[in-house]
């Protein structure tokens, strides 16, 4: 069907949406005293403060000295110390934020007239204890969706989806269950979720993660609906669950409280429609609205590199209408929206508030959890994104460790291993971070100074060199150009395809503070005789194994005229369309190398494995 084919829409020349102009948002703050009020935008030195207020420097230094804080003329006063000084010397004070290209994303404000607002669908996150049925509930809800059935039930995982209840009203679900994702978004200031559905197994009751989920939802002041799951089991005891939740002020309406409880089963789909109706009831009470007729803004919930599209992001629109051709800034990335599709794979021309869509057109991979804003000027958008990148680098170059850890480092009680990870997906990144938290080596710690989705770049190598960090790549190949830069800068890049092995290597390094030495042991070589291309797997090389053997999953190098062009892994190995584990010399086989786009007839695929070189004792 044509609706599933990518289309590049023309921008509507009669676009009447309210524009977002960066220049109109900019604000300068003039530090000084006006009408008895000292206005400032941030920390000042003692000398600067005295100059702006005409207070003698001796008086300021004496004031803080008597309070146990010795200062000099060049000492920097924090915003709290400035407030203290103002109160002591008879000034009112006011802290104002100066808005520039550097901080406009986090400080931009939209003053929409209430008459411009219209109801929007609620955005819901499922939370609860592991094994209580969060994922099963999401699947059950998805299967009730009439919109998906219109397209043959074909859906793709973009991180969020929409469903309709029996009356045709829409709800948006974030398809990343768990409070870790919820809290991670909030840590970046992203209040995406409107309603939390707390899943509790009726046969198991409250667990630690249930309590954590409640704390996170209450901290965000997000309404909670309780879904008591697994009611199809004979051991289910909903009254027990209700009593346990009472101490968290989650009391059902029939018990005199104001929390909605729904009893059901994700397995049998009992209670699903009641849950959807309850969500819409809360949404009606909370009155979620947005301005539809404005340049769009919202948040990214998933980012990745998608074959054929490049850097993509799944975003949820919170304000305005996003359209093809819009100029978007998303964290360090910017670009014009090139394609837009929903969870059913349908290519769209626009997305309205609460709508989740996957969009492409970015210059680099964005950052999940960051805010996106549509601007009317391409130059401003590019400058804002570049400023974000500069700030990231500054943060990365400042190792942020808690004070206790700093003291231990200074006293040489502890050593810190700086790490940089570049991976294939957000899921891999989360798994790596969890693996790092589980490493426990007395006297040692790991510090992830940078991590991201996408191939290793020259910037990653320069950061590794400047910080003395170890640089790791997971499930991604490595171009020869980047490898040459790393070699030139004296930076070692480790490519891994298994998280447990990566974690084991880092743990061994921590234990001995010695990097293991590996050597490449050749297994075999295959010559590329012909090429095919498949939309799902990329380039397929028809080869003849010339020496040794080729193994599926093995590391490999692509050689052209004896020069290494690419390093990766044998993702697929087939003999006459049948998957095989290995092929010996003299045999023909089809080979797919992960991430390799530049492959030619007569190239040589060198297959090898790494073996640790034992140190001489």
Swiss-Prot record:
<feature type="region of interest" description="G2">
    <location>
        <begin position="153"/>
        <end position="157"/>
    </location>
</feature>
<protein>
    <recommendedName>
        <fullName>Translation initiation factor IF-2</fullName>
    </recommendedName>
</protein>
<dbReference type="InterPro" id="IPR053905">
    <property type="entry name" value="EF-G-like_DII"/>
</dbReference>
<dbReference type="InterPro" id="IPR004161">
    <property type="entry name" value="EFTu-like_2"/>
</dbReference>
<feature type="compositionally biased region" description="Basic residues">
    <location>
        <begin position="1"/>
        <end position="11"/>
    </location>
</feature>
<keyword id="KW-0547">Nucleotide-binding</keyword>
<feature type="region of interest" description="Disordered">
    <location>
        <begin position="1"/>
        <end position="25"/>
    </location>
</feature>
<dbReference type="InterPro" id="IPR044145">
    <property type="entry name" value="IF2_II"/>
</dbReference>
<comment type="similarity">
    <text>Belongs to the TRAFAC class translation factor GTPase superfamily. Classic translation factor GTPase family. IF-2 subfamily.</text>
</comment>
<dbReference type="GO" id="GO:0003743">
    <property type="term" value="F:translation initiation factor activity"/>
</dbReference>
<dbReference type="InterPro" id="IPR023115">
    <property type="entry name" value="TIF_IF2_dom3"/>
</dbReference>
<dbReference type="Pfam" id="PF03144">
    <property type="entry name" value="GTP_EFTU_D2"/>
</dbReference>
<keyword id="KW-0648">Protein biosynthesis</keyword>
<dbReference type="Pfam" id="PF11987">
    <property type="entry name" value="IF-2"/>
</dbReference>
<feature type="region of interest" description="G3">
    <location>
        <begin position="175"/>
        <end position="178"/>
    </location>
</feature>
<dbReference type="InterPro" id="IPR005225">
    <property type="entry name" value="Small_GTP-bd"/>
</dbReference>
<dbReference type="GO" id="GO:0005525">
    <property type="term" value="F:GTP binding"/>
</dbReference>
<keyword id="KW-0342">GTP-binding</keyword>
<dbReference type="Pfam" id="PF22042">
    <property type="entry name" value="EF-G_D2"/>
</dbReference>
<dbReference type="GO" id="GO:0005829">
    <property type="term" value="C:cytosol"/>
</dbReference>
<dbReference type="InterPro" id="IPR015760">
    <property type="entry name" value="TIF_IF2"/>
</dbReference>
<feature type="binding site">
    <location>
        <begin position="175"/>
        <end position="179"/>
    </location>
    <ligand>
        <name>GTP</name>
    </ligand>
</feature>
<dbReference type="InterPro" id="IPR027417">
    <property type="entry name" value="P-loop_NTPase"/>
</dbReference>
<dbReference type="InterPro" id="IPR000795">
    <property type="entry name" value="T_Tr_GTP-bd_dom"/>
</dbReference>
<feature type="region of interest" description="G5">
    <location>
        <begin position="265"/>
        <end position="267"/>
    </location>
</feature>
<dbReference type="Pfam" id="PF00009">
    <property type="entry name" value="GTP_EFTU"/>
</dbReference>
<keyword id="KW-0963">Cytoplasm</keyword>
<feature type="domain" description="tr-type G">
    <location>
        <begin position="119"/>
        <end position="288"/>
    </location>
</feature>
<feature type="region of interest" description="G4">
    <location>
        <begin position="229"/>
        <end position="232"/>
    </location>
</feature>
<comment type="function">
    <text>One of the essential components for the initiation of protein synthesis. Protects formylmethionyl-tRNA from spontaneous hydrolysis and promotes its binding to the 30S ribosomal subunits. Also involved in the hydrolysis of GTP during the formation of the 70S ribosomal complex.</text>
</comment>
<feature type="region of interest" description="G1">
    <location>
        <begin position="128"/>
        <end position="135"/>
    </location>
</feature>
<dbReference type="InterPro" id="IPR000178">
    <property type="entry name" value="TF_IF2_bacterial-like"/>
</dbReference>
<feature type="binding site">
    <location>
        <begin position="128"/>
        <end position="135"/>
    </location>
    <ligand>
        <name>GTP</name>
    </ligand>
</feature>
<feature type="binding site">
    <location>
        <begin position="229"/>
        <end position="232"/>
    </location>
    <ligand>
        <name>GTP</name>
    </ligand>
</feature>
<dbReference type="InterPro" id="IPR009000">
    <property type="entry name" value="Transl_B-barrel_sf"/>
</dbReference>
<dbReference type="InterPro" id="IPR036925">
    <property type="entry name" value="TIF_IF2_dom3_sf"/>
</dbReference>
<dbReference type="GO" id="GO:0003924">
    <property type="term" value="F:GTPase activity"/>
</dbReference>
<keyword id="KW-0396">Initiation factor</keyword>
């Amino acid at each position: 069907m044509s609706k599933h084919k990518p289309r590049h829409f023309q921008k509507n020349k009669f676009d009447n949406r309210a524009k977002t102009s960066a220049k109109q948002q900019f604000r300068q703050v003039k530090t000084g005293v006006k009408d008895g009020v000292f206005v400032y935008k941030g920390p000042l030195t003692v000398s600067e403060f005295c100059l702006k207020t005409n207070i003698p420097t001796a008086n300021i230094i004496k004031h803080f000295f008597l309070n146990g804080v010795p200062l000099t003329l060049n000492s920097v006063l924090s915003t709290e110390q400035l407030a203290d000084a103002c109160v002591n010397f008879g000034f009112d004070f006011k802290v104002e934020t100066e808005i520039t290209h550097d901080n406009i994303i986090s400080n931009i404000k939209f003053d929409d007239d209430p008459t411009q607002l219209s109801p929007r669908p609620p955005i819901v996150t499922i939370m609860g204890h592991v094994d209580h049925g969060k994922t099963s509930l999401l699947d059950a809800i998805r299967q009730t969706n009439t919109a998906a059935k219109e397209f043959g039930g074909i859906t793709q995982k973009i991180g969020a989806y929409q469903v309709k209840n029996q009356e045709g009203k829409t709800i948006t679900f974030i398809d990343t269950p768990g409070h870790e994702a919820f809290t991670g978004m909030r840590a970046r200031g992203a209040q995406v979720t409107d309603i939390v559905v707390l899943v509790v197994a009726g046969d198991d009751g409250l667990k630690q993660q249930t309590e954590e989920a409640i704390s996170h939802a209450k901290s965000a002041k997000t309404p909670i609906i309780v879904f008591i799951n697994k009611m199809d089991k004979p051991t289910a005891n909903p009254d027990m669950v209700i009593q346990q939740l009472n101490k968290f002020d989650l009391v059902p309406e029939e018990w005199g409280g104001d929390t909605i409880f729904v009893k059901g089963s994700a397995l049998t789909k009992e209670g699903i429609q009641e849950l959807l109706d309850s969500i819409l009831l809360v949404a009606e009470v909370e009155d979620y609205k947005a301005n539809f007729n404005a340049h769009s803004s919202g948040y990214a919930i998933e980012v990745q590199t998608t074959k054929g599209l490049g850097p993509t992001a799944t975003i949820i629109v919170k304000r305005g209408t996003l359209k093809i051709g819009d100029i978007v800034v998303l964290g360090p990335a910017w670009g014009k929206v090139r394609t837009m599709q929903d969870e059913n794979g349908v290519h769209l021309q626009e997305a309205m508030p609460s709508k989740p869509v996957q969009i492409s057109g970015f210059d680099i991979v964005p950052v999940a959890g960051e805010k996106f804003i549509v601007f009317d000027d391409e130059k401003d958008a590019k400058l804002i994104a570049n400023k974000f990148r500069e700030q990231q680098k500054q943060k990365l170059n400042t190792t942020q460790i808690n004070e206790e850890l700093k003291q231990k480092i200074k006293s040489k009680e502890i050593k810190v291993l700086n790490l940089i990870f570049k991976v294939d997906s957000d899921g891999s990144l989360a798994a790596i971070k969890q693996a790092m938290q589980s490493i426990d080596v007395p006297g040692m710690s790991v510090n992830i100074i940078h991590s991201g989705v996408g191939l290793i770049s020259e910037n990653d190598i320069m950061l590794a060199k400047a910080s003395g960090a170890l640089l790791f790549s997971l499930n991604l190949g490595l171009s020869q150009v980047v490898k040459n830069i790393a070699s030139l800068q004296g930076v070692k890049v480790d490519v891994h395809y298994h998280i447990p092995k990566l974690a084991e290597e880092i743990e061994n390094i921590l234990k001995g503070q010695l990097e293991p030495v590996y050597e490449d042991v050749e297994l075999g070589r295959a010559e590329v005789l012909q090429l095919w291309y498949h939309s799902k797997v990329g380039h397929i090389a028809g080869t003849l194994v010339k020496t040794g053997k080729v193994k599926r999953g093995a590391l490999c190098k692509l050689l052209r005229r004896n020069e290494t062009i690419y390093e990766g892994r044998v993702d697929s190995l087939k003999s006459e369309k049948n998957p095989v584990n290995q092929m010996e010399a003299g045999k023909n086989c089809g080979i797919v190398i992960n991430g390799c786009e530049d492959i030619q007839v007569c190239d040589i695929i060198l297959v090898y494995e790494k073996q640790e070189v034992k140190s001489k004792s």
